[in-house]
């Protein structure tokens, strides 16, 4: 399991949690060992969920899922094990200067 962290801009209209145009931290969980080669496919997946201007700044391999204690992260990993990949988004917008 790999987690790619970065940020993306919301493109969703009238979403209850996210305002269009705001940027948020994201975590993309994937089982794809070639995730760096398949970055276009990964970004297409994220765009299909209503996010754009996607930038990744860190990738980490998770060797032992039992060490993950944060429930949102655990749920994201669970969905990735089921579906091959999963996206989590931080509710709080970020502002880049």
Where are these regions (language model features)?
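Long, contiguous binding/interaction regions
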Residues: 1-31, 36, 40-56, 60, ...
């Amino acid at each position: 399991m790999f987690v790619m962290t970065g940020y993306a801009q919301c493109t969703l209209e009238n979403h209850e949690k996210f305002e269009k145009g705001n940027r948020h931290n994201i975590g993309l969980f994937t089982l794809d060992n070639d995730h760096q080669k398949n970055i276009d496919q990964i970004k297409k997946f994220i765009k299909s969920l209503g996010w754009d201007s996607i930038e990744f700044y860190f990738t980490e391999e998770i060797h032992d899922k039992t060490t993950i204690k944060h429930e949102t992260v655990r749920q994201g990993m669970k969905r990735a094990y089921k579906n091959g990949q999963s996206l989590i988004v931080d509710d709080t917008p970020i502002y880049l200067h």
